[in-house]
């Protein structure tokens, strides 16, 4: 099958910034090639127009057109022309695009479009209790309604999306997956004496970073030796308009506690493994996700996790079986769960082993890729 992905992010040196969506597309693309499919990645919002190949994947970079009042529309038409040319050349049979801001809302293609829910702007505004821009909601709804197929990375994001957009369409749930060969634990790290808590991901309000400051203050009151390590890109804060979430966080830690906090900054996708391996526990106190790849990566490396108990979380972690789920606002309980795992090596290892097993059974990219292909085939059959 000849499959394309339309995205603004992908973790490649020649591409602009990439986060969770880009990582999930990369994992899927590489596995699809392994399974004998041809894959193209169309990257819009880039610094130049360029075509190149890597790992048997064809990349097409698109520089957005800038023209006051018409930039988005003209960029969409540029994307449309490129994809339709590739379809005419026999290089694409079906294309998958992410839901964010409805990039396909004004794109007419000569092949089926599948929209995958990773979380629209409307979805995240809903979870954050923030107003959404009317035009974004309109575009996202239009893109979803016009799609030939609809996938979702979790049941939760599908249900919420249907409700907020008043959609009657069904969504096929296929989770994000990871390459388990790249997440193989060094067993010597499971009994680590590093004694540190790891958060990795973007430093941003919606991921519960301002709750994490209070939680770690509580942890430090009991355990003065433990350290908190933060790895990820620093983002601006939408409510305070501050350009740095990290700067706000520093002011929220107790003074003596801050000495035990280290912010590493953003690291490459290849580097993150070593930080996860050496962590005693991983924490994810998020308020807004779709199905976070970071949680699955930590589970694959047999790490004990304390995560948010909101919505999507139960589709990844079974509370008190392969991790702990606690509401991020419940600082005391969250801190106590961290302390429990710091003090109980046996429980950490038990959680870690069961977490790995769940990833192998549900989130292996080999399984996930086959589920995607099965769905693409059904969409193509319907379009005949």
Regions found by a protein language model. Give the residues of each.
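Membrane-proximal helix-turn-helix segments that form the acceptor-binding/catalytic region
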Residues: 133-150
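Carbohydrate-associated surface elements
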Residues: 156, 177
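Conserved donor-binding/catalytic core segment of Leloir-type glycosyltransferases
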Residues: 190-207, 213-216, 228-231
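Nucleotide-activated donor-binding/catalytic signature segment of Leloir-type glycosyltransferases, i.e.
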Residues: 242-267
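Short alpha-helical donor nucleotide-sugar binding micro-motif in glycosyltransferases
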Residues: 266-267, 274-279
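Aromatic "clamp/platform" in nucleotide-sugar-dependent glycosyltransferases that forms part
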Residues: 287
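Short hydrophobic beta-strand element within catalytic cores of glycosyltransferases
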Residues: 304-307, 317
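Conserved acidic donor-binding segment of nucleotide-sugar-dependent glycosyltransferases
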Residues: 319-320, 324-331, 340-346
């Amino acid at each position: 099958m000849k499959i394309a992905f339309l995205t603004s992010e992908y973790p490649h040196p020649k591409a602009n910034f990439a986060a969770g969506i880009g990582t999930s597309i990369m994992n899927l693309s590489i596995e699809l090639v392994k399974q004998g499919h041809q894959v193209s990645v169309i990257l819009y919002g880039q610094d130049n127009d360029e075509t190149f190949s890597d790992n048997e994947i064809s990349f097409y970079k698109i520089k957005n057109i800038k023209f006051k009042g018409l930039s988005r529309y003209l960029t969409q038409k540029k994307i449309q022309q490129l994809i339709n040319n590739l379809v005419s050349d026999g290089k694409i049979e079906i294309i998958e695009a992410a839901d964010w801001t409805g990039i396909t809302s004004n794109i007419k293609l000569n092949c089926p479009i599948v929209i995958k829910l990773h979380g629209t702007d409307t979805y995240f505004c809903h979870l954050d209790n923030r107003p959404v821009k009317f035009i974004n909601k309109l575009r996202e709804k239009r893109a979803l309604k016009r799609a030939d197929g609809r996938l979702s990375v979790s049941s939760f994001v599908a249900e919420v999306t249907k409700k907020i957009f008043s959609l009657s369409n069904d969504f096929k749930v296929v989770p994000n997956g990871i390459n388990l060969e790249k997440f193989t634990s060094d067993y010597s790290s499971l009994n680590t004496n590093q004694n540190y808590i790891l958060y990795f991901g973007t430093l941003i309000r919606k991921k519960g970073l301002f709750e994490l400051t209070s939680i770690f203050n509580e942890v430090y009151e009991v355990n003065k030796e433990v350290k908190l390590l933060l790895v990820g890109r620093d983002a601006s804060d939408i409510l305070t308009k501050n350009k740095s979430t990290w700067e706000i966080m520093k002011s929220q830690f107790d003074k003596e506690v801050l000495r035990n906090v280290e912010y590493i900054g953003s690291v490459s996708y290849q580097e993150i493994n070593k930080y996860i391996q050496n962590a005693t526990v991983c924490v994810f106190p998020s308020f807004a996700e779709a199905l976070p790849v970071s949680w699955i990566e930590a589970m694959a490396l047999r790490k004990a996790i304390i995560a948010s108990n909101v919505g999507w979380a139960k589709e990844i972690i079974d509370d008190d079986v392969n991790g702990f789920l606690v509401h991020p606002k419940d600082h005391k309980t969250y801190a106590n769960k961290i302390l429990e795992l710091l003090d109980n090596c046996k429980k950490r290892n038990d959680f870690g082993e069961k977490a790995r097993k769940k990833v192998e059974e549900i989130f292996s990219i080999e399984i996930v890729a086959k589920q995607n292909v099965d769905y693409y085939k059904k969409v193509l059959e319907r379009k005949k």
